[in-house]
Every structure is written in structure tokens, then in C-alpha cells.
Curated annotation (Swiss-Prot):
GO terms for cellular component: cytosol; small ribosomal subunit. The gene is rpsM. Residues 107-120 have a biased composition (Basic residues). This is Small ribosomal subunit protein uS13. Part of the 30S ribosomal subunit. Forms a loose heterodimer with protein S19. Forms two bridges to the 50S subunit in the 70S ribosome. Residues 92-120 are annotated as: Disordered. InterPro entries: Rbsml_uS13_C, Ribosomal_uS13, Ribosomal_uS13-like_H2TH, Ribosomal_uS13_bac-type, Ribosomal_uS13_CS. Pfam families: Ribosomal_S13 (PF00416). Located at the top of the head of the 30S subunit, it contacts several helices of the 16S rRNA. In the 70S ribosome it contacts the 23S rRNA (bridge B1a) and protein L5 of the 50S subunit (bridge B1b), connecting the 2 subunits; these bridges are implicated in subunit movement. Contacts the tRNAs in the A and P-sites. GO terms for molecular function: rRNA binding; structural constituent of ribosome; tRNA binding. Coiled coil: none annotated.
Length: 120
């Protein structure tokens, strides 16, 4: 099993799809990586040599934010929005939808369970 940047890639999958198991790498970027390194898309993970695995890992490390670094960057971006106090930051702080969705009837996932306001 090939291990790249702390993630074990599935053995039997094609390399272009196996790379998408890493957080931060989609199908398009995995194809870009394989083109840059010069590996065929049709190769399976168990067919890769150690040199090919190391070249893929080197390319990912040079060009992409993946796994923990990506998560940390996203959290820092959200925190900076909250510190600025702009509209998106306030919505994040209150736990409401950020991208313009209506909250009169829906947004239960984001708002949590219903709270009854008054009773007779």
C-alpha cells in the first residue's frame, strides 16, 4: 500500500482516483500531478514503483495544501472573518447560514433543534 503524506492509498484503484482520497486533491489536480510527474492515468497503485511514489509525494508537497495544513488554513480564514466582524463573520459566529440562504423555515442543520419560544 502506497503512503503519501500520511494517507494510505487504496491498492487496487487507479492512481488518478486514489489520489483523490487525500483531503485537498480532486480529480483535476490529481490528473495535473500525474501529467507533471509523467505517470499514466491507467496505472494502479500497487503497480507504482518507489521512485514514482516519491515523485508524486514531492510534487504534492511543493504545489498543494493538503490534509491538516488545508484544514488549518480554512479554520484560520473563518477565524479572521469572525475577528473582522463583517457579515460573513457574524453569521459564522451565530451559527447561521453564511451564503444567503433563508432561515425563516429551514436551516435546521445549521441552527440546531427547534426551541419553543412561548406557550400558553
Amino acid at each position: 500500500m502506497a503512503r503519501i503524506a500520511g494517507v494510505d492509498l487504496p491498492k487496487k484503484k487507479r492512481v488518478e482516483y486514489a489520489l483523490t482520497c487525500k483531503n485537498g486533491i480532486g480529480l483535476k489536480s490529481s490528473r495535473e500531478i500525474l501529467e507533471a510527474v509523467g505517470i499514466s492515468f491507467d496505472k494502479r497503485v500497487h503497480e507504482l514503483s518507489e521512485d514514482e511514489v516519491s515523485s508524486i509525494a514531492k510534487k504534492i508537497q511543493q504545489s498543494y495544501l493538503v490534509e491538516g495544513d488545508l484544514r488549518k488554513k480554512v479554520q484560520m480564514d473563518i477565524k479572521s472573518l469572525m475577528d473582522l466582524g463583517n457579515y460573513r463573520g457574524i453569521r459564522h459566529r451565530k451559527g447561521l447560514p453564511v451564503r444567503g440562504q433563508t432561515t425563516k423555515n429551514n436551516a435546521r442543520t445549521r441552527k440546531g433543534k427547534k426551541k419553543t419560544v412561548g406557550s400558553k
